[in-house]
Amino acid sequence: MPKTVKNPKNNKSRSRGAPIQVAESIGSGSAKIKKKIRDIERLIKKNPNLPADKKIEYDRALKGLKVELQNSQVQNKAKVLAKKYHMVRFFERKKAVRKLKNLRKEFERISQTGIRKDIKKARKQLRHGEIDLAYVILFPKTEKYISLYPSPNDEDQTDPNVIKGLKITEERRREFRKYIEKLMEEGKLPFSIDDALQGKNIRLDNDKTQKAVLTEEIDAPEQKQDEQQEEQDDFFE
C-alpha cells in the first residue's frame, strides 16, 4: 500500500486558517487564560501574512481574553482581601447596626419633644449612622478595607511616611462616605437600611450594577452573650 505523502503547504494552510478556540479558557483561571494569550500571540508572530479575516479574528480573541484575564485577576484579588478582612468587616457591621438602632430610638424620643433644633441634630446623626452601615456593606471588596472604627495606631505619629499614609486613608474613608451619601440622596442604594438592620446578608452580584442579593446572615456566628459581642466591638473603638 503506497504511503500517503503529507503536503507541508496544507499543514501551513491549516495553521493559518485554524479557528481560535477561546471558549474553554473563559472562567478557567488566570494561568490558562495567560497560556491561551501567549499561544495566539505566538501564532500571529509566526504567520505575518495571515489572511485579513483571520487577523481580525485573532485580534478580537486576544482583546476578549485580555479582558477576561483582567476580570479573573480582579476576582482573585477580591477573594484574598475578602478573606483577610472578613472578621473586621463582620464586627464593624455589628457595631454599625447596634449604633444605628440606638440612633433611631434617640431620634424617636427627641421627635416627641417638638424642639426643632434638637430634632435636626438627631436627624443628621441618624443619617450618619445609616451611611456608616452602608459603608461597611458596600466598601469595594477589591480594595484594602479602611475601617470606620480603627484601633489606636502604635506607629510613630511624627514619621512623615506614617502621616502621609494616615492622610491618604482618611481621604479615602471620607470620599467613600460621600459616595454612599450621594447614593442615598438619589435613591440608588442597592438595598434598604431596614434589610441591613434585620441582619440579612447583602451580597452584590456586580459592583458596577450594584445589584444586591439578600439572604440569611451567614458572615459569622452570633455571639452567645451580649457581653462578648460588646467586648469584641469595642476592639474597634
Swiss-Prot record:
Residues 1-24, 206-237 are annotated as: Disordered. Belongs to the EFG1 family. GO terms for biological process: maturation of SSU-rRNA from tricistronic rRNA transcript (SSU-rRNA, 5.8S rRNA, LSU-rRNA). It comes from Candida albicans (strain SC5314 / ATCC MYA-2876). This is rRNA-processing protein EFG1. Disulfide bonds: none annotated. Residues 228-237 have a biased composition (Acidic residues). The lineage of its organism: Eukaryota, Fungi, Dikarya, Ascomycota, Saccharomycotina. Keywords: Coiled coil, Nucleus, rRNA processing. It is found in: Nucleus, Nucleolus. It holds the Pfam family Efg1. Residues 53-113, 166-186 form a coiled coil. It comes from the Eukaryota. Involved in rRNA processing. One of its GO terms (cellular component) is nucleolus.
